From Swiss-Prot:
GO biological process, one term: positive regulation of GTPase activity
Source organism per UniProt: Homo sapiens (Human)
Site (Glutamine finger): Q197
Record-linked InterPro entries: Rab-GAP-TBC_dom, Rab-GAP_TBC_sf, Rab_GAP_TBC_domain
Record field: compositional bias (Low complexity): 55-75
Domain (Rab-GAP TBC) ranges: 115-300
Organism placement in taxonomy: Eukaryota, Metazoa, Chordata, Craniata, Vertebrata
Name of the featured protein: EVI5-like protein
Keyword list, A-Z: Coiled coil, GTPase activation, Phosphoprotein
Gene that produces this protein: EVI5L
PROSITE patterns in the record: TBC_RABGAP
Positions of post-translational Phosphoserine modification: S685
Amino acid sequence: MASPTLSPDSSSQEALSAPTCSPTSDSENLSPDELELLAKLEEQNRLLEADSKSMRSMNGSRRNSGSSLVSSSSASSNLSHLEEDTWILWGRIANEWEEWRRRKEKLLKELIRKGIPHHFRAIVWQLLCSATDMPVKNQYSELLKMSSPCEKLIRRDIARTYPEHEFFKGQDSLGQEVLFNVMKAYSLVDREVGYCQGSAFIVGLLLMQMPEEEAFCVFVRLMQEYRLRELFKPSMAELGLCIYQFEYMLQEQLPDLNTHFRSQSFHTSMYASSWFLTLFLTTFPLPVATRVFDIFMYEGLEIVFRVGLALLQVNQAELMQLDMEGMSQYFQRVIPHQFDSCPDKLVLKAYQVKYNPKKMKRLEKEYAAMKSKEMEEQIEIKRLRTENRLLKQRIETLEKGQVTRAQEAEENYVIKRELAVVRQQCSSAAEDLQKAQSTIRQLQEQQENPRLTEDFVSHLETELEQSRLRETETLGALREMQDKVLDMEKRNSSLPDENNVAQLQEELKALKVREGQAVASTRELKLQLQELSDTWQAHLARGGRWKESPRKLVVGELQDELMSVRLREAQALAEGRELRQRVVELETQDHIHRNLLNRVEAERAALQEKLQYLAAQNKGLQTQLSESRRKQAEAECKSKEEVMAVRLREADSMAAVAEMRQRIAELEIQREEGRIQGQLNHSDSSQYIRELKDQIEELKAEVRLLKGPPPFEDPLAFDGLSLARHLDEDSLPSSDEELLGVGVGAALQDALYPLSPRDARFFRRLERPAKDSEGSSDSDADELAAPYSQGLDN
């Protein structure tokens, strides 16, 4: 459904048809070649007036754009000759657009700055952004049939978009319906951006000039090619960049006003966010905002920076006298209506502002580097927080496991004590075995001696009984050790499977093997002793018959020799078993010592790594502490310097204000003298001349009175200078997220939509006490500003 082409309102028609406020001719700013081209165009345009097609195009409803290239004072019909020339010229531009863009770009730029005629805006805007033939136009009808997740938000804000305009007034009106269609279609085309507050005002202005399909194509091109898409993204990173660049320009060109804003905590985003998001459509009336939008379509966001800084330059003196609340009201009530009668003056002021594209590119790179650095710092902080959380969890785990470790250490200590007792018993058994072997050797030596006494035999019997007793005790001790080993195995099975416990179990197993070998050796020794005892008993039985026949003596000697051989064999076997057991013990001890050394080495390496980590962490913390101290000292010095600079600049500004007021008074007097002199030159009445001479004398007397007082009699004296709020680091935003978080949402809401009834009653109550003072200050400001503005015109 296409929307008809509508004019903004009646006031816009009057403003667009008004002549240029500046009395100087624009032809003075053109080169000779361009002037010659204009003369030729005038000749061709006059010839084209005779053509019927040109006449039909001229006889329609027309509106003047408020600017022309060649001024003319003659009027022959309803449309002046100036309007006819402008219409014919813009018709030629629309028909020969490509040639004008290639060869006459400078002249085209001047024409656009003077203003595009209302009925040409639709086609010229489409040509400027190359939106005449876009593939997305064919998809528009299909997009309207789809559903968008942003429909509720769009419906909510449509009623607050141009609520006073006839085209959008009334619920479910034609204007609101086509506005909803365009916003819904774009939210489906660009799902990343979707819908953002402020974009509806731009679409609404487009719908006032062209049908909805063409408005949709132009809006898509604006979002893609004019940086608006980056402005309306959820992160609003481009808006932060624009605020950063505008703050730099404000600080460079208006340092006193910038200092005043900071001292009052009046952030740039509180008043400039809506300028960039709505392109002044919510700030100025539609005639003035449309002029700014014409230039934006050709030059981009540069005009927003220029117009914004021009507004601050014009109102610097008034803003310097206001606090934060007063400045907010001044931006909402006074600034929007300063250029209603003459938009050309605003454009002239805007192009007097210094704008350096290279410097803006450099600021963009600095902002990107700053944002990347902030992102890296946030990532590093997040990593440190994660690491800190993991360390805390590890400490809690270690504290919980500390009790278990203590219990394990106590149980290991008990096992080691029992193992020491078992080793001591094993060593005593080995000593008993050595004693038994020495006894066997003594018996063998005595066996070699044929003469044995009864005392020696009784001694051997006593030793045999003692050895049997010791053997019985050894067997009892072995049984006790076996019981203890079984008990320790049961206790070890209930303990956690740690490295030290496993090693102790291996040692216990090796000890059990050695104990088994010792038991086997003891049994074999017992058998050998039994055999030796039997042999000895037999020998004793034969000892009483040694006086028998020689044959028996020979048999006895052979038996003795056999017994000695067996004793030597038993001794050799015992020595072999002893050596094998010793080898096993040495291997076990070597294995235990190696395991112990490995554990000690692992613990030493772990402690060394922990020591290095703690040393590195301590070094980093010391570096951060020194850096923080250095930054704090620099910040304190910088704050003191800025305070002194603010005081000096404020004193200079007060002196400049006083000088400017005196200069304004002098200019007013000169203007009155010139006016009276002109009247004198054209008058023939002598009586009138005498009256004028009297008036001149009175004016001269007033001049002497005005020149008499000193320039600092007003209340703005240096004695009243005070700096209650100094700049410090706390008053400045730490990042763009905080800057946007403080001011963007509130400033955008206040700029886009009117105040609620409750807020309006609050501001009316605030205005009642200061009504008289405001009236007097406004009248004084108007009296001082009127001659100054007329002097600029002259």
